[in-house]
Amino acid sequence: MIMEIPAIKALSRYAQWVIWKKERDTKIPYNPNNGKKASSTDPLAWGDIDEAQAGLVRYGANGLGFVLTKSDPFVFIDLDHVLDENKRVKCEWARQLLKEIKSYTEISPSGDGLHVVVSGKLPDYIKHKTKFDDGSALEVYESGRYMTITGEVFDGRDDIKELDLSILGEFAEHKIETKNAPVQIESATTLDDEAIIDLMKRKGQWPDAPKDGDDWSSLDMSFANRLAFWCGKDIERMDRIFRQSPLMRQKWDRPTAGSTYGRITLKKACDFVDSVYDPALRNESDCPFEPYNEEGGPRNDKEEKDPLWLYKVLLTKGIEVWFDIKLEKYGIKRNNRVDYIAKSSLQQIVFEIIGKTPKNIAVPTYIGAYEPSKPEKWEEEGIKYINLFKPTPLMKVKPVKEMPEIVKNLLLNLFDYDAKSMGLFINWLAFIYQYKERTGVAWIFMGKQGTGKGLLVDLLKKIFEEHMSSNITDANLDSQFNPYLYNKLIVHLNEVSADNRKSRMLVKNRLKTWITDETLYINRKNMKEVEIKNFCNFIINSNETIPVDIEDSDRRFNVIECNNVLKEQEWWTTESYQEILNNAEGFAKYLAGIKVDRSKVNEVVMSEKKKAIVETTESVLKQIAKALTDRDIEWFLDNGLEGVVEKNIVNDFQWEELQEAITTGVIPNKYLMIIVEQILGDSKTITWIKRNIITPYQVGETTVVKMAGKPIRAIVVG
C-alpha cells in the first residue's frame, strides 16, 4: 500500500495532489475532483491524497502527482535515463549523487529513471535542467512544477530527509552552474537609511518583533519584499536596514548554498518585486504590499474602517471568498467554479497575489447551498446563503425542435430501435435538463462493449460539465467517502460489478437510498459530514449479467440491453465519435425544446432484460430459505451479514445472539427481519418474510421463545 511509505505519509499532509494521464510523450496533470486539466500554479485544481486516489480510478488516469509550491519544504530531483534494464544505476554521475543525497527515492513511471524528494532549499545558482552526453539528464525543482509519484521505492530509501542541497554545486563537471548570477541594482532613491526606515514606519511597512509560533521565514521574505521596493533593489542597503529590524538574528548570516541565508532572501525579493520607490515621482502607492500587523493585515485606520480589505482585493482579481459556517471551510469562486478549501490553501492563493501570507482573512460568512431555482445569493430566517449552482454554457442555449441526426443514430443504436424506451429516456433527460431535479428513477445500460454506452456519457458530460460525476466504480461505492454525489444532477456508475451476492447487496443498498431519498449525507475527507438536498439522477453502465438486484415490484430501474456494436453500423465512420461530441450543443438545444411529460418521468418498463434480473433476484429468496433451513451461518457471512455490525444495526452482544439464533434454528422475528433486510438490501416486514420466504419454502413455523426473560415471537427452522 502506497500510504504505508513514510515519504508518502509526509507528502499526504499537503492538499497538493493531482492525477496525470500520458498523452503522446507528455504526462498531463488533471484535477482529481472533476477530471479537468490542472495547473501547477492553481491550488483549486488540486486535492488531498484520498481525492487523488479516488480520481485515479474514476477518471482512468495513469498515476498520482504532487505539486511543489513555495509553501512546502520539498525539492524534487529527477534523474532521467539513469537505470539499465535490470533497474541498476548505469551512470557514474548518478551513482555519486545518490551517495551524497540519501532521501526518498522511487523509480519513475518510465522505469529507467529515478525521482528523489528532499526537504531543503534549492540553491538559486543551480540550473533547473542539465543534459549529459550519454543521454541522461538531471532536473531539479522546488515550486511551480508537479512530480509524478509511483511509490516504487528504490534501494529501501522510503523516507524524506532534510539535507543541505549545496552539495549539488559539486557537480560542476556535469554542467551545473556554480556561479552566482549578477544582481541587477536599480536604485532611484537619494534618501539615507534612517529616512527609509522612518518612511517605512510611517507607512506601516516596518515589522514588529515576532511572537512564539510565528513563521519567521515568511516574515523575513515579506519584509525583504518591502525593502526591495523602498531601497530600489539595492541589496547592500536592504541588508543594512534589515539588520536594524526586529527580525535580525544569527540565522541571517548562516552559510547557505555558497552564500548566506540573508543574501539569498534579499536576492529572491529583488527577483520578485517589479516596481521600486522613486522620491521624485512620489510613487509610494506603487508599493505592491499592503501595510501589515502581527495578524498579517493592514496596520492603520484602513483596517478599522474596512475589515474586508483583503476580500475586496481578491474580488478585483476575479476571486470571491466566503467562510461556510456549516462546513467550516472557505468557499472560493473563480472562473465560474466553486470549490471548498482549507485555510492553508487560501493562504497560498493570497500569497501568490499579494506576496505575503496573512494569518487571518476576514471574509463574509454564508452557507453554501446548491439550489438551481434560487438567485445567486439570498437570505432565509436571518441566514445568508450563497448559491453553488452555476449553469454551464450548454445549459443556457436557445431551444430547437430537431435532434442532431447523428445523436439520434447513437440513441437508436443503444435502445435497439425501441422507440418507447428511447422516448422515456429522452423525456427523463429533458426533465433533468430543464427542471434540474431528482427523478426517482435510474437507467441501467447493459450489454456488449463498443455499443455507445460510454459515448453517451461523454456526450452528457459536455452538456452538464461539473454538474455530472462520471466513471464512479465499485471502489468508490465501497468507500466511506462519497464526494461524487455532492451537488450533482447526474451520476454515472461505470462497470458496476456484481459477481457475488455481497457486491449486488452493496450496490442495491446504496442506490436505494440515493435514488429515492430527499436528502443525502455527504462525507468528504477532512470535512464535516453534511446533509444536503438530493438532486442526483443515475445512469449505470455494466457488462455484468446482474449489476443490481431488482424485485418484481420495483419502481426504480429501467434496464436497457445494448447489443449493437457501433463499428458494425452502416452510418458509423472513424469521425463519428468526435462528430457526436461536436453536436453536444445541438443536443442540448433539443433537450431545452422538448415539452416534458412529467407524468412519464418516473415511468418504468418491464423489459426482457429487467425481467431476467427479477427472476434471478427471486432465486435469492430460495437461497435464503435454504441457508435458514440448513442453519448455514457461513452462507450468511459470505453474503455480507457482518454489515449489520459495521452499520451499528446491532451491537457486539446482539451480533453474538444473532449468529447463535441462526445456528440453533430459533430466530426471533426482530433478528429475522435484520437478516433478510441486510441480504436483500430492502426493509422487510415479518409479514413479507412469511409470505415470500417462510410459507412458499416451508422454512419453519412461528413460535414464542423467551429471551432475557421476556417472551419473543420467533421462527423455528430446520
Swiss-Prot record:
Mg(2+) binds at residues 78, 80, 108, 115. Gene3D superfamilies: P-loop containing nucleotide triphosphate hydrolases. Its EC number is 2.7.7.-, 2.7.7.7, 3.6.4.12. Its cofactor is Mg(2+). It comes from the Viruses. Residues 1-176 are annotated as: Polymerase. It catalyses: DNA(n) + a 2'-deoxyribonucleoside 5'-triphosphate = DNA(n+1) + diphosphate; ATP + H2O = ADP + phosphate + H(+). The keyword Nucleotide-binding applies. Coiled coil: none annotated. Changing residue 556 to A: 15x weaker dCTPase activity. InterPro entries: NrS-1_pol-like_helicase, NrSPol-like_HBD, NrSPol-like_head, NrSPol-like_tail, P-loop_NTPase. GO terms for molecular function: ATP binding; helicase activity; hydrolase activity; transferase activity. Changing residue 251 to D: Much weaker primase activity. No effect on extension activity. Multifunctional protein with primer synthesis, DNA polymerization, and DNA helicase activities. Recognizes a specific sequence motif 5'-TTTGGTTA-3' and initiates DNA synthesis. homohexamer. The N-terminus region is involved in polymerizing DNA and catalyzing de novo DNA synthesis. The helicase region forms a hexameric ring. This is DNA Primase-polymerase. It comes from Nitratiruptor phage NrS-1.
